[in-house]
Curated annotation (Swiss-Prot):
Changing residue 113 to G: Abolished interaction with INTS13 component of the integrator complex. One of its GO terms (cellular component) is nucleus. This is Zinc finger protein 655. Interacts with VAV1 and CDK4. Interacts with INTS13; promoting association with the integrator complex. There is a cross-link at residues 77, 190, 201 (Glycyl lysine isopeptide (Lys-Gly) (interchain with G-Cter in SUMO2)). Its main location: nucleus. It comes from Homo sapiens.
Length: 491
């Protein structure tokens, strides 16, 4: 990079500008200014170059950085749109934290890029902007965005330095995103970002180069709170504790999400359709669930059945529907009608008889009696997974799998269980109770399975006796192997 002499011909003052491409003289009425907030003022009055200004960024280097930046932004957009909207993915806090850190890096890269590149269309001259006059004054256009723009102008003919700074306007506190924000304004991408519930935090990232580095793995964060959360991975610290079940978590958000298991709270409610959502009080626990539910209202039905021209929004629903036209494994023995599901067949068979549809046995179980064949019904259905049960108590016990409820608590150690049988079995450990005794030898067991296993061992023992020696074997193969010793001796 060539240095411009500080003095030209006498009587023709020049103004020195720091440019991204090169340090050039302003000889045109429309100069191009480029910001570099990290640089000090360029040249002293006698033309000597300061040490800080020797490292100017070449144009080729900037082009490479811009290209790399665009490629990375494209990859990030692709990764975010490809995130599966299932509960299992969003429960993985490690993947969520990695995705957040990726986006923070790109926002930081965008901010750095904007600090060193300012288009000349951003500036407009209100006063004299020609270069042949010693006193120069420039101003910014009223449409300039909120970032701070600093322009330093030096008069090389005089030792007086004109340091003209153009600061940010009243809206400067708000961090704006140029290309990145516009790219993510599409409904599909923005929905994925908002689903992560951290878009507002990313927009409020301060315009600073301060960073926090992890001493263990070297990972860099832009906020001290993010570093503190990350360090809990190495220390395995879990400061947030649930008062209900005493389970600990490393993040407060995880504890809040866990508390919904005890309170059965479902805060995400669909407002798109009163008929299918609010009328039935349709709500979902994780944010991914409500997004998946909202797609019922917005998704186009693009899967069409070739036989009956019925349209479905999901391919699995179409596949299940096509079984009606192809596979009919359930057949009515009265009229010969075919059905694809057993439930449809049972519903149909009620038409053929005028008798009482339900009969009850001594246990209170309901049956459908038709031509001597008993079809046991399961009238209790789980609203979460659709599984059917014959007794209401079985349904209540099954629903604890979804809610995570452990209603049966041990009085001695405080451990909780979802089933009464598990609690009773646990109590035997404290009492050291062994209620299952063996009749053949003096011994008792706390579990019936242990007793059965011991009895099987005793029945196998001494089942195979040797005729020569008084030796017993529990397996025939051992006896045959032993008897081969006698056959060799006799031979």
């Amino acid at each position: 990079m060539e240095e411009i002499p500080a003095q030209e011909a006498a009587g023709s003052p020049r103004v020195q500008f720091q440019s991204l491409e090169t340090q050039s003289e302003c000889l045109s009425p429309e100069p191009q200014f480029v910001q570099d907030t990290d640089m000090e003022q360029g040249l002293t009055g006698d033309g000597e170059t300061r040490e800080e200004n020797k490292l100017l960024i070449p144009k080729q280097k900037i082009s490479e950085e811009v290209h790399s930046y665009k490629v990375r932004v494209g990859r990030l957009k692709h990764d975010i749109t490809q995130v599966p909207e299932t509960r299992e993915v969003y429960k993985s806090e490690d993947r969520l934290e990695r995705l957040q850190e990726i986006l923070r890096k790109f926002l930081y890269l965008e901010r750095e890029f904007r600090q060193i590149t300012i288009s000349k269309e951003t500036f407009t001259s209100e006063k004299n902007n020609e270069c042949h006059e010693p006193e120069k004054s420039f101003s910014l256009d009223s449409t300039i965005d909120a970032d701070q723009r600093v322009l330093r102008i030096q008069n090389t003919d005089d030792n007086d330095k004109y340091d003209m700074s153009f600061n940010q306007n009243s809206a400067s506190g708000k961090h704006e995103h140029l290309n990145l924000t516009e790219d993510f304004q599409s409904s599909e991408c923005k929905e994925s970002l908002m689903d992560l519930s951290h878009l507002n935090k990313w927009e409020s990232i301060p315009n600073t180069e301060k960073s926090y580095k992890c001493d263990v793995c070297g990972k860099i964060f832009h906020q001290s709170s993010a570093l503190t959360r990350h360090q809990r991975i190495h220390t395995r610290e879990k400061p947030y504790k649930c008062k209900e079940c005493e389970k600990s978590f490393s993040q407060s958000s995880s504890l809040s999400r866990h508390k919904r298991i005890h309170t059965r709270e479902k805060p995400y409610k669909c407002e798109a359709s009163d008929k299918s959502c609010e009328a039935s009080d349709k709500s979902c626990s994780p944010s991914s669930g409500i997004i998946q539910h909202k797609k019922i209202h917005t998704r186009a039905k693009s899967y069409k059945c070739s036989s009956c021209e019925r349209v479905f929004s999901r391919s699995v629903h179409l596949t299940q529907h096509q079984k009606i036209h192809k596979e009919m494994p359930c057949k009515c023995t009265v009229c010969g009608s075919d059905f694809c599901h057993t439930s449809y067949l049972l519903e149909h068979q009620r038409v053929h008889h005028e008798e009482k549809a339900y009969e009850y046995d001594e246990y209170g179980l309901a049956y459908i009696k038709q031509q001597g064949i008993h079809f046991r019904e399961k009238p209790y259905t789980c609203s979460e997974c659709g599984k059917d049960f014959r007794l209401n108590s079985h349904l209540i016990q099954h629903q604890r799998i979804h809610t995570g409820e452990k209603a049966h608590e041990c009085n001695e150690c405080g451990k909780a269980f979802s089933q009464t049988s598990c609690l009773i079995q646990h109590h035997k450990m404290h009492r050291k109770e062994k209620s299952y005794e063996c009749n053949e030898y003096e011994g008792s067991f706390s579990h019936s399975s242990d007793l059965i296993l011991q009895q099987e061992v005793l029945t196998r023992q001494k089942a195979f006796d040797c005729d020569v020696w008084e030796k017993n074997s529990s397996q025939r193969a051992h006896l045959v192997q032993h008897q081969s010793i006698h056959t060799k001796e006799n031979s």
